Amino acid sequence: MTNTRKTHPLMKILNNSFIDLPAPSNISPWWNFGSPLGICLIIQILTGLFLAMHYTSDTMTAFSSVTHICRDVNYGWLIRYLHANGASMFFICLFLHVGRGIYYGSYMFLETWNIGVLLLFAVMATAFMGYVLPWGQMSFWGATVITNLLSAIPYIGSDLVQWIWGGFSVDKATLTRFFAFHFILPFIVAALAGVHLLFLHETGSNNPSGLSSDADKIPFHPYYTIKDILGVLLLILALTSLVLFSPDLLGDPDNYTPANPLNTPPHIKPEWYFLFAYAILRSIPNKLGGVLALVLSILVLAIIPLLHTSKQRSMMFRPFSQCLFWILVADLITLTWIGGQPVEHPFIIIGQLASILYFFLILVLMPITSLLENNLLKW
């Protein structure tokens, strides 16, 4: 008798993706971040759906509706904080997932990597629009500042900004369309994640050594299902701890003040996961230059495969490249810190140096070091 999971048209897809999938026997916990990302997306869609049942996307009532969710709706406070902190967890997993890809050379799977970069942009757009919805001070001014950056685009800039705003300032039309886009984008992200997996399963997973693992494969279930469950449980533990003990730790106190177009907050800053890009934006005194640097800070990921000069795929056996990778991580942490600081000495110069180092490491130092390592190994 044939097994249903191997013959049924729908079950067959799931079987080939999560049960009988041949996986390398030596993949480390750094390969675990795909499943927590999937769980994060499911948590965000479910909590978001319940929030949308009570939220109103009108400038007069948006702030009050969020207050109503927290005070009057059964476990509304829990749903709201799970959604807000779930986004932070999502980005932590995303950054670790991308970092793993860079360290172990997973970017050599071009389609998978490029869809991953597209996914990163989509998730960032979703998070930005979600931050605007509570209509607090930082929501309003964050939306104003970030959308205004598009005015730096020559010729069509100012028209484009007014088109996005739906008027001459961030107002009711902006809030309504941001809510609509914030609702639809996670489903687009889910579809892209499916395509991401599709292309990954065409090639099979990479592994820490960067060598072909065709000679030594094991089934995904039970080995990696149980391993992934551990990662997911740790994610849920971290998320629930954050939500139940310190839900406002990563938020901005300014967002507990209703939006007021007549009163600018002293320090306008985005959520913590955008601070590195915000620091790069602020480090360039020219508006258009800043916007280009901001976009390139993420888009540079797409050209990393073109800059791969090493004859080895992974950094596992390349100590100099490892050193540069960890300097890059430290640089990104520095940029995140600078993004949250006021624009004054010494933060300005630190931000500028960290921004230069970020691009210099990726575009110049890492490719040159890879060539040097090739020569050291007489390759």
UniProtKB/Swiss-Prot annotation:
Protein residues bound to heme b b566: H97, H196
Lineage, opening ranks: Eukaryota, Metazoa, Chordata, Craniata, Vertebrata
PANTHER family xrefs: CYTOCHROME B (PTHR19271:SF16)
PROSITE patterns linked to this entry: CYTB_CTER, CYTB_NTER
Function description: Component of the ubiquinol-cytochrome c reductase complex (complex III or cytochrome b-c1 complex) that is part of the mitochondrial respiratory chain. The b-c1 complex mediates electron transfer from ubiquinol to cytochrome c. Contributes to the generation of a proton gradient across the mitochondrial membrane that is then used for ATP synthesis.
GO CC entries: mitochondrial inner membrane; respiratory chain complex III
Cofactor(s) the record lists: heme b
Organism: Episoriculus leucops (Long-tailed brown-toothed shrew)
Family: Belongs to the cytochrome b family.
Highest taxon listed in the record's lineage: Eukaryota
A Pfam family it matches: Cytochrom_B_C
Designated name of the protein: Cytochrome b
Gene it is expressed from: MT-CYB
An MF annotation (GO) of this entry: metal ion binding
Cofactor note: Binds 2 heme b groups non-covalently.
UniProtKB keywords: Electron transport, Heme, Iron, Membrane, Metal-binding, Mitochondrion, Mitochondrion inner membrane, Respiratory chain, Transmembrane, Transmembrane helix, Transport, Ubiquinone
Record's bilayer topology term: Multi-pass membrane protein
Keyword presence, GTP-binding: no
Other facts noted in the record for this chain: Heme 1 (or BL or b562) is low-potential and absorbs at about 562 nm, and heme 2 (or BH or b566) is high-potential and absorbs at about 566 nm.
Transmembrane segments: 33-53, 77-98, 113-133, 178-198, 226-246, 288-308, 320-340, 347-367
Subunit structure: The cytochrome bc1 complex contains 11 subunits: 3 respiratory subunits (MT-CYB, CYC1 and UQCRFS1), 2 core proteins (UQCRC1 and UQCRC2) and 6 low-molecular weight proteins (UQCRH/QCR6, UQCRB/QCR7, UQCRQ/QCR8, UQCR10/QCR9, UQCR11/QCR10 and a cleavage product of UQCRFS1). This cytochrome bc1 complex then forms a dimer.
InterPro entries (alphabetical): Cyt_b/b6_C, Cyt_b/b6_C_sf, Cyt_b/b6_N, Cytb/b6-like_sf, Cytochrome_b, Cytochrome_b_C_euk/bac, Cytochrome_b_N_euk/bac, Di-haem_cyt_TM
Residues annotated as binding heme b b562: H83, H182
Chief location bin: mitochondrion
Residues the record lists as binding a ubiquinone: H201
Subcellular localization, as worded in the UniProt entry: Mitochondrion inner membrane
One GO term (biological process): mitochondrial electron transport, ubiquinol to cytochrome c
